[in-house]
Amino acid sequence: MAGRPGSSNAEAAGAVGPTDEARGQAESSQKIEDLMEMVKKLQKVGSLEPRVEVLINRINEVQQAKKKASEELGDARTVWETLQKELDSLSGEKVRLKEILSKKQETLRVLRLHCQDKENEAQRKQTMLQECKERISALNSQIEQEKNKQRQLRLDFEEQLEDLMGQYKDLWEFHKPERLALEISTLDSGKEQLLKEEKLVEAKLEDVKHRLCSQFGAKGHTINEGLFLRSPEAAAVVHLFEEENRKAQELLEAAAQRQEQLQQKCQQLQQKRQRLKEELEKLGVQVLAQAQSKQEEEAGLGEAANPKPLGVSEEKDQEPSTK
């Protein structure tokens, strides 16, 4: 940029040099022509002698002017050559500066493109970062929901397990096999006792009949037996015997019915116990499978957000299920 005024000055100097030279030559030739015309005029007039001294002075002046013009012309040529050299050097400097400017402009363009690429990359990374933050927030909320759901499932499972364990405990306490076996043995012994009493009553009845037969004889057996059977004592004995027999039959039937009910109840309790055990095993397996699957899902989701708290929650979730 600093070379431009110099180049303009050099061009101006180059233009001024030839102009001064032409001007000096024109002046000297003009003076010579003036002198020649003056000489011709004097020759015509005939008064040349008085003007010789004037002519000599004028010639001297012309020579001095010519010499001065020649010197000025030499100086102008020297200046012109110097300015021409300076102009050439400034032209080369101008070309070099143009090349440097072109390179700088190309570098600036590349840097601008690079800066634009960096800005686009930064914008893209900022967008990706924002998306990752939103995704992490969504995953954290989803993990929290899964934790709450898992906690609720665990609480429900614990309540169901406690309820089933309470029912199983009540059934086990009130209907133990030892207790049922004891009741069955008690009923069996009562049944045997009733059978013994029935046999004893039958033996007593046979004994009474035998005594009656021995007292009244074989002949009047039917008459005496009929009279005896019609008597109030016989009716009372028969009524008593029938009452005892009926009671014994009722007790025997009640004992048999009770034994059958106890056996059926024992079978039902065993079936119910087996069913409760199967339900407990099935429910435990299902809950464990659900807990394991939920924990695996939480572990998979927590790898992107916060795996360590997720692992701690999984250990907390596994503790009640193992208990």
From Swiss-Prot:
Alphabetical GO biological process terms: cell division; synaptonemal complex assembly
UniProt feature coiled coil, ranges: 25-290
UniProt keyword list: Cell cycle, Cell division, Chromosome, Coiled coil, Meiosis, Nucleus
InterPro entries xref list: SYCE1 (IPR026676)
Amino acid composition bias (Polar residues), ranges on this chain: 1-10
Biased amino acid composition, Basic and acidic residues: 20-31, 313-323
Entry superkingdom: Eukaryota
Major location (coarse): nucleus
Subunit text: Homodimer. Found in a complex with SYCP1 and SYCE2. Interacts with SYCP1, SYCE2 and SYCE3. Interacts with SIX6OS1.
Functional description taken from the UniProt entry: Major component of the transverse central element of synaptonemal complexes (SCS), formed between homologous chromosomes during meiotic prophase. Requires SYCP1 in order to be incorporated into the central element. May have a role in the synaptonemal complex assembly, stabilization and recombination.
Record-given protein name: Synaptonemal complex central element protein 1
Lineage, highest ranks first: Eukaryota, Metazoa, Chordata, Craniata, Vertebrata
